[in-house]
Protein backbone atom coordinates (compact mmCIF):
# COMPACT_ATOMS: atom_id res chain seq x y z
CA UNK A 1 0.00 0.00 0.00
CA UNK A 2 1.35 3.41 -0.95
CA UNK A 3 2.00 5.59 2.08
CA UNK A 4 0.70 9.06 2.92
CA UNK A 5 2.76 11.42 5.00
CA UNK A 6 1.53 13.17 8.12
CA UNK A 7 1.64 16.61 6.48
CA UNK A 8 -0.76 15.52 3.73
CA UNK A 9 -3.11 13.92 6.26
CA UNK A 10 -3.12 17.09 8.38
CA UNK A 11 -3.72 19.25 5.30
CA UNK A 12 -6.80 17.32 4.23
CA UNK A 13 -8.33 16.70 7.68
CA UNK A 14 -10.40 19.92 7.93
CA UNK A 15 -11.85 19.43 4.43
CA UNK A 16 -12.57 15.79 5.22
CA UNK A 17 -14.47 16.73 8.37
CA UNK A 18 -16.58 19.32 6.54
CA UNK A 19 -17.40 16.92 3.72
CA UNK A 20 -18.40 13.86 5.72
CA UNK A 21 -22.07 12.99 6.19
CA UNK A 22 -22.94 13.74 9.82
CA UNK A 23 -26.40 12.25 9.24
CA UNK A 24 -24.95 8.94 8.09
CA UNK A 25 -22.42 8.87 10.92
CA UNK A 26 -25.17 9.56 13.43
CA UNK A 27 -27.35 6.84 11.94
CA UNK A 28 -24.67 4.18 12.32
CA UNK A 29 -23.75 5.40 15.81
CA UNK A 30 -27.36 4.94 16.93
CA UNK A 31 -27.22 1.29 15.91
CA UNK A 32 -24.02 0.36 17.74
CA UNK A 33 -24.26 -2.14 20.57
CA UNK A 34 -20.90 -1.12 22.03
CA UNK A 35 -17.96 1.22 21.62
CA UNK A 36 -15.24 -1.06 20.28
CA UNK A 37 -14.06 0.49 17.01
CA UNK A 38 -11.54 -0.81 14.47
CA UNK A 39 -10.08 1.94 12.27
CA UNK A 40 -8.34 0.60 9.15
CA UNK A 41 -5.53 2.65 7.57
CA UNK A 42 -5.91 4.96 10.54
CA UNK A 43 -2.99 7.29 9.80
CA UNK A 44 -2.69 9.87 12.58
CA UNK A 45 -6.18 9.25 13.97
CA UNK A 46 -8.36 11.74 12.07
CA UNK A 47 -11.21 9.23 11.99
CA UNK A 48 -11.16 8.96 15.78
CA UNK A 49 -11.22 12.74 16.13
CA UNK A 50 -14.26 12.90 13.87
CA UNK A 51 -16.17 9.94 15.27
CA UNK A 52 -15.67 10.37 19.01
CA UNK A 53 -18.40 12.98 19.33
CA UNK A 54 -20.96 10.62 17.79
CA UNK A 55 -20.52 7.70 20.21
CA UNK A 56 -23.35 7.53 22.74
CA UNK A 57 -22.45 7.78 26.40
CA UNK A 58 -24.43 4.65 27.27
CA UNK A 59 -22.05 2.53 25.17
CA UNK A 60 -19.34 2.80 27.83
CA UNK A 61 -15.72 3.82 27.48
CA UNK A 62 -14.63 3.61 23.84
CA UNK A 63 -11.90 1.24 22.78
CA UNK A 64 -10.20 2.33 19.56
CA UNK A 65 -7.98 -0.08 17.65
CA UNK A 66 -6.01 1.88 15.06
CA UNK A 67 -4.39 -0.24 12.35
CA UNK A 68 -2.01 1.04 9.68
CA UNK A 69 0.98 -0.06 7.61
CA UNK A 70 3.06 2.87 8.88
CA UNK A 71 4.39 2.68 12.46
CA UNK A 72 5.47 6.34 12.34
CA UNK A 73 1.94 7.51 11.61
CA UNK A 74 0.59 5.32 14.39
CA UNK A 75 3.15 6.74 16.82
CA UNK A 76 1.95 10.24 15.94
CA UNK A 77 -1.65 9.11 16.37
CA UNK A 78 -0.87 7.80 19.85
CA UNK A 79 0.54 11.20 20.83
CA UNK A 80 -2.32 13.19 19.30
CA UNK A 81 -4.97 10.95 20.84
CA UNK A 82 -3.27 10.40 24.18
CA UNK A 83 -5.69 12.53 26.19
CA UNK A 84 -8.84 10.92 24.80
CA UNK A 85 -11.30 9.17 27.05
CA UNK A 86 -11.15 5.40 26.73
CA UNK A 87 -8.49 3.15 25.30
CA UNK A 88 -6.48 3.91 22.17
CA UNK A 89 -4.54 0.89 20.88
CA UNK A 90 -2.33 1.03 17.80
CA UNK A 91 -1.14 -1.90 15.73
CA UNK A 92 1.21 -1.86 12.73
CA UNK A 93 -0.15 -4.37 10.23
CA UNK A 94 0.42 -5.17 6.56
CA UNK A 95 -3.13 -4.40 5.51
CA UNK A 96 -2.70 -5.98 2.09
CA UNK A 97 -2.44 -9.40 3.77
CA UNK A 98 -4.35 -8.73 6.99
CA UNK A 99 -7.57 -10.38 5.81
CA UNK A 100 -6.04 -13.50 4.29
CA UNK A 101 -6.23 -16.84 6.11
CA UNK A 102 -4.74 -17.87 8.45
CA UNK A 103 -4.54 -14.30 9.79
CA UNK A 104 -6.82 -13.72 12.76
CA UNK A 105 -9.98 -11.78 12.02
CA UNK A 106 -9.18 -8.16 12.90
CA UNK A 107 -12.90 -7.46 12.93
CA UNK A 108 -13.68 -10.03 15.63
CA UNK A 109 -15.25 -8.38 18.66
CA UNK A 110 -15.51 -4.97 16.98
CA UNK A 111 -18.81 -3.12 17.13
CA UNK A 112 -17.78 -0.85 14.26
CA UNK A 113 -15.23 -1.29 11.47
CA UNK A 114 -14.39 2.01 9.83
CA UNK A 115 -11.98 3.62 7.39
CA UNK A 116 -11.60 6.96 5.66
CA UNK A 117 -10.32 7.42 2.10
CA UNK A 118 -9.34 3.76 1.81
CA UNK A 119 -11.77 1.78 -0.32
CA UNK A 120 -10.82 3.32 -3.67
CA UNK A 121 -7.25 2.05 -3.12
CA UNK A 122 -8.15 -1.61 -2.61
CA UNK A 123 -9.05 -4.46 -4.95
CA UNK A 124 -12.29 -6.38 -5.43
CA UNK A 125 -10.72 -9.41 -3.76
CA UNK A 126 -9.61 -7.42 -0.72
CA UNK A 127 -12.94 -5.65 -0.30
CA UNK A 128 -14.86 -8.90 -0.66
CA UNK A 129 -12.65 -10.40 2.04
CA UNK A 130 -13.30 -7.42 4.30
CA UNK A 131 -17.05 -7.72 3.82
CA UNK A 132 -16.85 -11.40 4.72
CA UNK A 133 -14.77 -10.74 7.85
CA UNK A 134 -17.14 -7.99 8.98
CA UNK A 135 -20.16 -10.23 8.43
CA UNK A 136 -18.54 -13.07 10.37
CA UNK A 137 -18.00 -10.66 13.29
CA UNK A 138 -21.43 -9.02 12.82
CA UNK A 139 -19.69 -5.64 12.86
CA UNK A 140 -21.37 -2.50 11.60
CA UNK A 141 -19.29 -0.57 9.07
CA UNK A 142 -18.70 3.06 8.15
CA UNK A 143 -16.48 3.94 5.19
CA UNK A 144 -15.99 7.64 4.56
CA UNK A 145 -14.66 9.71 1.69
CA UNK A 146 -14.36 7.05 -0.99
CA UNK A 147 -13.36 8.80 -4.21
CA UNK A 148 -16.02 8.34 -6.91
CA UNK A 149 -14.33 9.77 -10.00
CA UNK A 150 -15.86 13.22 -9.92
CA UNK A 151 -13.57 16.21 -10.40
CA UNK A 152 -14.94 19.63 -11.31
CA UNK A 153 -12.76 22.73 -11.54
CA UNK A 154 -13.61 26.35 -12.15
CA UNK A 155 -12.72 28.49 -13.97
CA UNK A 156 -12.73 25.80 -16.63
CA UNK A 157 -9.71 24.86 -18.73
CA UNK A 158 -9.75 22.96 -22.05
CA UNK A 159 -7.79 20.01 -20.61
CA UNK A 160 -9.97 19.50 -17.50
CA UNK A 161 -11.82 16.45 -18.85
CA UNK A 162 -8.65 14.88 -20.23
CA UNK A 163 -6.83 15.22 -16.91
CA UNK A 164 -9.81 13.86 -14.97
CA UNK A 165 -10.02 10.81 -17.23
CA UNK A 166 -6.28 10.13 -16.91
CA UNK A 167 -6.46 10.52 -13.12
CA UNK A 168 -9.32 8.03 -12.98
CA UNK A 169 -7.30 5.55 -15.04
CA UNK A 170 -4.43 6.04 -12.60
CA UNK A 171 -6.78 5.38 -9.68
CA UNK A 172 -7.19 1.81 -10.91
CA UNK A 173 -3.46 1.01 -10.74
CA UNK A 174 -2.39 -1.45 -8.04
CA UNK A 175 -1.92 0.46 -4.77
CA UNK A 176 -0.62 -2.59 -2.93
CA UNK A 177 -3.87 -4.56 -2.67
CA UNK A 178 -4.15 -5.72 -6.28
CA UNK A 179 -5.85 -3.78 -9.12
CA UNK A 180 -7.56 -0.87 -7.36
CA UNK A 181 -11.31 -0.34 -7.58
CA UNK A 182 -10.80 3.40 -7.90
CA UNK A 183 -14.04 5.27 -8.70
CA UNK A 184 -16.05 2.01 -8.63
CA UNK A 185 -15.22 1.27 -4.99
CA UNK A 186 -18.29 2.65 -3.22
CA UNK A 187 -20.73 0.91 -5.55
CA UNK A 188 -18.81 -2.35 -5.25
CA UNK A 189 -18.77 -2.07 -1.45
CA UNK A 190 -22.53 -1.50 -1.38
CA UNK A 191 -23.09 -4.68 -3.38
CA UNK A 192 -20.60 -6.71 -1.34
CA UNK A 193 -22.20 -5.84 1.99
CA UNK A 194 -25.78 -6.10 0.71
CA UNK A 195 -25.00 -9.60 -0.57
CA UNK A 196 -24.11 -10.56 3.02
CA UNK A 197 -27.39 -9.33 4.46
CA UNK A 198 -26.38 -5.82 5.43
CA UNK A 199 -28.67 -2.83 5.23
CA UNK A 200 -26.65 -0.28 3.26
CA UNK A 201 -26.95 3.50 3.13
CA UNK A 202 -24.85 5.94 1.12
CA UNK A 203 -24.48 9.72 1.12
CA UNK A 204 -22.34 12.08 -0.93
CA UNK A 205 -19.35 13.61 0.85
CA UNK A 206 -17.78 15.82 -1.80
CA UNK A 207 -14.90 18.13 -1.06
CA UNK A 208 -15.95 21.72 -1.89
CA UNK A 209 -12.67 23.59 -2.04
CA UNK A 210 -12.51 27.36 -2.37
CA UNK A 211 -10.03 30.09 -1.48
CA UNK A 212 -9.97 28.89 2.13
CA UNK A 213 -8.07 25.74 1.05
CA UNK A 214 -5.33 26.97 -1.32
CA UNK A 215 -2.63 24.58 -0.18
CA UNK A 216 -4.87 21.54 -0.51
CA UNK A 217 -5.88 22.69 -3.99
CA UNK A 218 -2.23 23.10 -4.94
CA UNK A 219 -1.36 19.61 -3.72
CA UNK A 220 -4.29 18.12 -5.62
CA UNK A 221 -3.43 19.87 -8.87
CA UNK A 222 0.21 18.84 -8.69
CA UNK A 223 -0.69 15.26 -7.77
CA UNK A 224 -3.25 15.00 -10.55
CA UNK A 225 -0.75 16.33 -13.07
CA UNK A 226 1.84 13.76 -11.98
CA UNK A 227 -0.73 10.96 -12.24
CA UNK A 228 -1.89 12.10 -15.68
CA UNK A 229 1.66 12.23 -17.05
CA UNK A 230 2.39 8.78 -15.62
CA UNK A 231 -0.55 7.38 -17.58
CA UNK A 232 -0.03 9.42 -20.76
CA UNK A 233 3.58 10.66 -21.12
CA UNK A 234 2.80 11.92 -24.62
CA UNK A 235 0.47 14.51 -23.07
CA UNK A 236 3.14 16.00 -20.78
CA UNK A 237 3.15 19.42 -22.42
CA UNK A 238 -0.63 19.75 -22.33
CA UNK A 239 -0.81 18.54 -18.74
CA UNK A 240 1.94 20.89 -17.61
CA UNK A 241 0.19 23.81 -19.28
CA UNK A 242 -3.02 22.83 -17.52
CA UNK A 243 -1.18 22.62 -14.19
CA UNK A 244 0.38 26.07 -14.63
CA UNK A 245 -2.98 27.68 -15.39
CA UNK A 246 -4.81 25.86 -12.61
CA UNK A 247 -2.17 26.88 -10.06
CA UNK A 248 -2.46 30.48 -11.28
CA UNK A 249 -6.20 30.34 -10.55
CA UNK A 250 -5.41 29.16 -7.02
CA UNK A 251 -2.84 31.91 -6.50
CA UNK A 252 -5.38 34.50 -7.66
CA UNK A 253 -8.01 33.21 -5.22
CA UNK A 254 -10.52 32.36 -7.94
CA UNK A 255 -10.13 28.56 -8.05
CA UNK A 256 -12.98 26.31 -6.99
CA UNK A 257 -12.58 22.52 -7.01
CA UNK A 258 -15.16 19.84 -6.25
CA UNK A 259 -13.87 16.31 -5.64
CA UNK A 260 -16.52 13.61 -5.56
CA UNK A 261 -16.66 11.24 -2.59
CA UNK A 262 -19.19 8.85 -1.10
CA UNK A 263 -19.77 7.80 2.50
CA UNK A 264 -21.21 4.33 3.14
CA UNK A 265 -22.70 2.86 6.31
CA UNK A 266 -24.00 -0.68 6.68
CA UNK A 267 -25.32 -2.85 9.49
CA UNK A 268 -26.94 -6.20 10.10
CA UNK A 269 -30.45 -6.43 11.51
What are these regions (language model features)?
Residues 45-98:
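Class I SAM-dependent methyltransferase SAM/SAH-binding core
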Residues 107, 199-269:
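Conserved Class I S-adenosyl-L-methionine
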Residues 139-204:
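Conserved catalytic/acceptor-binding region of the Class I
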Residues 98-108:
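Short amphipathic alpha-helix with an adjacent loop that forms part of the alpha/beta core around
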Residues 1-32:
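Class I SAM-dependent methyltransferase Rossmann-like catalytic core
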Residues 121-134:
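A short, conserved alpha-helix within the catalytic core of class I
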Residues 35-43:
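Conserved class I S-adenosyl-L-methionine
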